[in-house]
């Protein structure tokens, strides 16, 4: 059976009090609507139509060709929004799910189960519901004496008795597609809001003797919509908790989950330890037996087995097996560290390749460079890679020793097994097996201060 989805993403989001389009506010580093799209796609849907309005081009820019789009010029209610997908879906057979673009916590598993329940019951419509302690603001599920759905009533149209009901509509539905578009034309706006409500489609189906099901989820967090910054922070916290829980169940030690942020696209191997205050974002891959020290930040990087990152920042970089970074080091984009490398305190590496066993232990800047195997870079060494207009490369061979407080003025190549004396400013290439000294000779005048 063909399956389709409509994502409702046309609302203004005035309560966000933001210049940014509502569904583009981020949870766990991704726009809310992107989380929804990924869950919808993961549930086995063949075609997605996103209903856009305010900020349409921004939404299209984020989702790209993963969705079709329909424009809702006036926001006249959820049924009106769904009807905007008519040109794409009206003639389609199969099941269509309708999901709100501001529900970033909905999972593909719940959508899969909703669809399965709907199709197994041969229903014309199914609503995803939940029971919550504070149902204010949600449509209520009104059941008849036999426990079947009688109608869904919106908060502003509900009687006090209906407001006391704690089973609510999530705003997520599954429909027989043909039935959906047939009934949408019959929906009226004679309600307190003067809007065309999508739940009225269910009442129309019931009035015709059709089958309408309710599937109740036990995970209330999943259906939480985000309408303001407070709810945005709650969704962020819930996503953080879910992600950390997943990693811990898969063998990762997270010492303080409440202070640890791990993005949804991060992968972490078993027996890795994440200390408090850590942030790991983007498409980061972390191996096994790694230690990520407290207050480290890692973005879009690869950390191989056995590495240790101590209170450092790693951006768009790779760290080899058993390599130690920090404390207080910064790996900038293009930093590539081999195995058993040491990058110590207050060292900055940018667009540089440090081969296996290389050491840069303290207070250095290494940029646009290649450092050979087992080479030691002394404290305070700087690659002078920029002349104000262009960047130049520094190459240091294997098994070399560069003393403290050395300036390597690029472009320059230092060979293998070279010793560069402390305090030197190297401007010329140095061949293999050489000693390079480039500093003024010391002059001492005894008794000068008497």
From Swiss-Prot:
Record keywords: Acyltransferase, Cell shape, Cell wall biogenesis/degradation, Cytoplasm, Magnesium, Metal-binding, Multifunctional enzyme, Nucleotidyltransferase, Peptidoglycan synthesis, Repeat, Transferase
Q: Where is this region: Pyrophosphorylase?
A: 1-229
EC number(s) from the headed UniProt entry: 2.7.7.23, 2.3.1.157
The annotated pathway is: Nucleotide-sugar biosynthesis; UDP-N-acetyl-alpha-D-glucosamine biosynthesis; N-acetyl-alpha-D-glucosamine 1-phosphate from alpha-D-glucosamine 6-phosphate (route II): step 2/2; Nucleotide-sugar biosynthesis; UDP-N-acetyl-alpha-D-glucosamine biosynthesis; UDP-N-acetyl-alpha-D-glucosamine from N-acetyl-alpha-D-glucosamine 1-phosphate: step 1/1; Bacterial outer membrane biogenesis; LPS lipid A biosynthesis
What are the start and end residues of every segment in region (Linker)? 230-250
What are the positions of the active site? Answer: 362
> What cofactors does the UniProt entry give for this protein?
Mg(2+)
Cofactor annotation remark: Binds 1 Mg(2+) ion per subunit.
A GO cellular component term found in this entry reads: membrane
Q: Which protein family is named in the record?
A: In the N-terminal section; belongs to the N-acetylglucosamine-1-phosphate uridyltransferase family.
- What name has this protein been given in UniProt? Bifunctional protein GlmU
- Please report the organism this UniProt entry assigns to the protein: Staphylococcus aureus (strain USA300)
């Amino acid at each position: 059976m063909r399956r389709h989805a409509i994502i409702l993403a046309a609302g203004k989001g005035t309560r966000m009090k933001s210049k940014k389009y509502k569904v583009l506010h981020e949870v766990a580093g991704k726009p809310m609507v992107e989380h929804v799209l990924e869950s919808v796609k993961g549930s086995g849907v063949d075609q997605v139509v996103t209903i856009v309005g305010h900020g349409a081009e921004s939404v299209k820019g984020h989702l790209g060709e993963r969705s079709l789009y329909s424009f809702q010029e006036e926001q006249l209610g959820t049924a009106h929004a769904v009807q905007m997908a008519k040109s794409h879906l009206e003639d389609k057979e199969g099941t269509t799910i309708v999901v709100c673009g501001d529900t970033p916590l909905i999972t593909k598993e719940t959508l899969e189960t909703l669809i399965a329940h709907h199709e197994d019951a041969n229903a014309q419509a199914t609503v995803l519901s939940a029971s919550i302690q504070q149902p204010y603001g949600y449509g209520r599920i009104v059941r008849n004496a036999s426990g079947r759905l009688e109608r869904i009533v919106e908060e502003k149209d509900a009687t006090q008795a209906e407001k006391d009901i704690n089973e609510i509509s999530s705003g997520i539905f599954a429909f027989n597609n043909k039935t959906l578009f047939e009934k949408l034309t019959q929906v009226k706006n004679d309600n307190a809001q003067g809007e065309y409500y999508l739940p009225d489609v269910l009442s129309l189906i019931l009035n015709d003797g059709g089958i309408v099901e309710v599937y109740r989820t036990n995970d209330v967090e999943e259906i939480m919509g985000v309408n303001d910054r407070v709810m945005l922070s709650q969704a962020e916290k819930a996503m953080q908790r879910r992600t950390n829980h997943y990693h811990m169940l898969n063998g990762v030690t997270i010492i303080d989950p409440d202070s640890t942020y791990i993005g949804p696209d991060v992968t972490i191997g078993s027996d890795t330890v994440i200390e408090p205050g850590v942030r790991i974002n983007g498409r980061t891959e972390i191996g096994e037996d790694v230690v990520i020290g407290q207050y480290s930040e890692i973005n879009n990087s690869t950390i191989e087995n056995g590495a240790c990152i101590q209170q450092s920042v790693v951006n768009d970089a790779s760290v080899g097996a058993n390599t130690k970074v920090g404390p207080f080091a910064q790996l900038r984009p293009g930093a590539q560290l081999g195995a058993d490398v040491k990058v110590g305190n207050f060292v900055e590496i940018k667009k540089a390749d440090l081969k296996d066993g290389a050491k840069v232990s303290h207070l250095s800047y290494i940029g646009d460079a290649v450092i050979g195997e087992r080479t030691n870079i002394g404290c305070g060494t700087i690659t002078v890679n920029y002349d104000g207009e262009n960047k130049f490369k520094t190459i240091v061979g294997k098994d070399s020793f560069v003393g403290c407080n050395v300036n390597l003025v690029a472009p320059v190549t230092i060979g293998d097994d070279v010793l560069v004396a402390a305090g030197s400013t190297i401007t010329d290439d140095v061949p293999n097996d050489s000693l390079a000294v480039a500093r003024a000779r010391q002059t001492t005048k005894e008794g000068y201060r008497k």
